[in-house]
Amino acid sequence: AGRTLRELGVNVNLAPVADVAGPGSALARDGRTFGTDPAAVARAAAAFAAGLRAEGVAAAAKHFPGLGAARVSTDDAPVVIRRSRAALRGRDMR
């Protein structure tokens, strides 16, 4: 991805999606996350960002902690995540 973007003259990619997918979430249905395991998602997102940087493309990981639990896409509707701070820290911010 990084090489292709660099060859096209792109120097910033609003990626990777670093959200931890929740059961039945829009991001999981759309295949837009690296999975449901926080540690695996962190490793994959870090590797993706490193690959971009190696080609001279800056990475901007997204979205916000908890968004992986959203049932609808933020492209289609506003989303409210009703998780406690402890729940976010325990799953989405490890």
What residue ranges belong to the model's regions?
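Glycoside hydrolase catalytic-domain context in secreted enzymes
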Residues: A1-R94
